[in-house]
Amino acid sequence: MPELPEVETVRRGLQPFMEGATVVRVEQNRPDLRFAFPENFAERLSGRRIEALGRRAKYLTVHLDDGLSIISHLGMSGSFRIEAEDAQGLPGGFHHERSKNSLHDHVVFHLMRPDGASARIIYNDPRRFGFMLFAEKGALEEHPLLKDLGVEPTGNLLSGEVLAALFKGRRKPLKAALLDQRLIAGLGNIYVCEALWRAGLSPMRAAGSVAGEMDVMERLAGAIRSVIAQAIAAGGSSLKDYIQADGALGYFQHSFSVYGREGKPCRNPACGGTVERVVQSGRSTFFCASCQT
């Protein structure tokens, strides 16, 4: 399932084609995805201008000129495809002709951009685990999907001091604490494994046991920020279904230090250990027992 870097990459890919554009019409090819589409979904979007594209945790948000917002989640296999004349040469792009919709193209946004050029933004989702919901004017931050989300792990929002406060008194393992969306929003299995390796911390260690060690908290916060920033710069990680909005694959998976590397040498040159895999809360955890303590 796409994590924060993948969703941010999609947002950045869509932004030049969607922000400022007017929705001419929307093709809705089925009544539901994971959830039913909002009532009058296509009708309420027609004629609206897209003012901004945002992201909160793993959710893409589309903000319209009447105050309505779309909250979208890619699920397991969702992707957006851009078709526009100036997308010529990009995977999924077209020039002087309209491509044929595929079986799993469930929503097509027909847009008129500020310069008068047209574009189509196509949402494709074979497994249909994604969704698109509305948040009414002024209600986005209090939407049930968003209101309880924790701090974003980007920029300077996440610090050692913040982590220490979040982890204080918590008995759950570090990995479980980092995956708790109420504490830190947008982190997933891949990037938590990678950040813990960079910080030299065991995923099984109790979160509260390190909350008082400010140097450790700063090291972990820095590891999280750097992993997320590098993954965004690499276009995310393509393991199964994820592609960028222009059809390209992310390539951060080539930089994995532990994730998916069970039995292979640890990439810490001072270590000499081997990457191990254990299951925590039903998810695979990859780590090096030699250098993560």
From Swiss-Prot:
Disulphide bridges, residue numbers: none
Annotated DNA binding sites: H104, R127, R170
Cross-referenced InterPro entries: DNA_glyclase/AP_lyase_DNA-bd (IPR015886), DNA_glyclase_Znf_dom_DNA_BS (IPR015887), Formamido-pyr_DNA_Glyclase (IPR020629), FPG_cat (IPR012319), MutM-like_N-ter (IPR035937), Ribosomal_uS13-like_H2TH (IPR010979), Znf_DNA_glyclase/AP_lyase (IPR000214), Znf_FPG/IleRS (IPR010663)
Q: Could you tell me the EC number(s) of this protein?
A: 3.2.2.23, 4.2.99.18
State where the FPG-type zinc fingers lie: 257-293
Q: Which reaction does it catalyse?
A: Hydrolysis of DNA containing ring-opened 7-methylguanine residues, releasing 2,6-diamino-4-hydroxy-5-(N-methyl)formamidopyrimidine; 2'-deoxyribonucleotide-(2'-deoxyribose 5'-phosphate)-2'-deoxyribonucleotide-DNA = a 3'-end 2'-deoxyribonucleotide-(2,3-dehydro-2,3-deoxyribose 5'-phosphate)-DNA + a 5'-end 5'-phospho-2'-deoxyribonucleoside-DNA + H(+)
UniProt subunit comment: Monomer.
Function field:
Involved in base excision repair of DNA damaged by oxidation or by mutagenic agents. Acts as a DNA glycosylase that recognizes and removes damaged bases. Has a preference for oxidized purines, such as 7,8-dihydro-8-oxoguanine (8-oxoG). Has AP (apurinic/apyrimidinic) lyase activity and introduces nicks in the DNA strand. Cleaves the DNA backbone by beta-delta elimination to generate a single-strand break at the site of the removed base with both 3'- and 5'-phosphates.
Q: Which GO terms describe its molecular function?
A: 8-oxo-7,8-dihydroguanine DNA N-glycosylase activity; class I DNA-(apurinic or apyrimidinic site) endonuclease activity; damaged DNA binding; zinc ion binding
Q: Which PROSITE patterns match?
A: FPG_CAT, ZF_FPG_1, ZF_FPG_2
Tell me the cofactors it needs: Zn(2+)
The family note in this entry says: Belongs to the FPG family.
Protein's name according to its UniProt entry: Formamidopyrimidine-DNA glycosylase
Q: What is the organism of origin for this protein?
A: Brucella canis (strain ATCC 23365 / NCTC 10854 / RM-666)
Active-site residues per Swiss-Prot or TrEMBL entry: P2, E3, K58, R283
Q: Has UniProt tagged this entry with the keyword Repeat?
A: no
Q: Explain how, and how many, cofactor molecules are bound.
A: Binds 1 zinc ion per subunit.
GO terms of biological process kind: base-excision repair
Which SUPFAM superfamilies does the annotation name? Glucocorticoid receptor-like (DNA-binding domain), N-terminal domain of MutM-like DNA repair proteins, S13-like H2TH domain
* Keywords on record: DNA damage, DNA repair, DNA-binding, Glycosidase, Hydrolase, Lyase, Metal-binding, Multifunctional enzyme, Zinc, Zinc-finger
Q: Does the keyword Signal apply?
A: no
